[in-house]
Amino acid sequence: MVKVTLVTAQWCHYCPTAKKVWRDLKDKFNFEYEEIDYESPEGEKLADKFSIVSVPTTIIDDQIVFVGVPDKDKASKTLEKPV
């Protein structure tokens, strides 16, 4: 199963829009989804592992796929094909 991880921050003005994109797609596609706060211990580990310097950042199956708010159509196409 595809795993989508969205790295966000409370102070991020674009993160609510990115969350909405992935939550809406969750209703259409079958994938595992989690939201991780950039400033949490888990978020800090992901930031180190993937050299994340900007939020929102979307990681799909252990690869950064989107930095910033993903376009819903592009995100849909990403979920339709293997990453």
Q: Could you say what each language-model-derived stretch is?
A:
Residues 16-20, 45-49, 70:
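Generic recognition of short, well-ordered alpha-helical segments
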Residues 31-44:
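Thiol-based oxidoreductase modules, predominantly thioredoxin-like and allied folds used
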